[in-house]
């Protein structure tokens, strides 16, 4: 099994996504775990969402819409057919983000940070997974939060390596391209860490 990691700058736009496809076609994609960061400066943009959330700023909605617009443009650049399932999948991710912002009761900054910033990686891997499938590569999108188990020390969680190894062994498919997120895990209550 090979592991490739693509950082945010390498997947900041449609051309970057196409380049990842080109790299995988060149080096092979069977028995691969592809770990992908949030696209471009998405983490910074989501940190602005967090700031607006805690400040109860009227700019909260527009800061979310900026992140959404950025990702929707990449999706439009990759997929001309707006009926492609990727549009629904990305919109579902943003619906989850908006639901969290509307219903969260926790005042814990670190908890909120982990829940919100994680959407960058979740959305980027969703887009990349759909594009690889669209290009004919058998792909398994893996929510790394189901694999990497941690304690509840938000923003500085410690990994339960024994449980994590078991989860990876059980979930990762050989002979296919497994696309997942970096920097994420989840605690015993399945909250993102």
Model-derived segments and their meaning:
Residues 1-193:
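Nucleotide/pyrophosphate-binding catalytic subdomain
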């Amino acid at each position: 099994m090979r592991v490739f990691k693509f950082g945010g700058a390498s997947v900041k736009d449609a051309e970057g996504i196409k380049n990842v496809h080109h790299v995988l076609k060149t080096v092979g994609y069977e028995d691969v775990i592809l770990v992908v960061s949030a696209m471009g400066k998405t983490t910074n943009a989501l940190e602005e969402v967090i700031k607006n959330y805690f400040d109860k700023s009227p700019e909260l909605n527009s800061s979310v819409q900026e992140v959404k617009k950025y990702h929707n443009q990449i999706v439009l650049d990759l997929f001309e057919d707006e009926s492609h399932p990727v549009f629904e999948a990305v919109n579902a991710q943003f619906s989850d983000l908006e639901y969290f912002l509307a219903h969260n009761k926790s005042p814990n900054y670190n908890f909120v940070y982990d829940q919100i910033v994680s959407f960058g990686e979740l959305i980027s891997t969703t887009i990349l997974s759909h594009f690889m499938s669209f290009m004919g590569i058998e792909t398994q999108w893996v929510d790394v939060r189901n694999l990497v188990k941690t304690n509840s020390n938000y923003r500085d969680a410690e990994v339960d390596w024994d449980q994590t190894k078991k989860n990876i062994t059980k979930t990762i498919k050989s002979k296919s391209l497994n696309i997942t997120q970096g920097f994420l895990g989840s605690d015993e209550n399945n909250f993102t860490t």
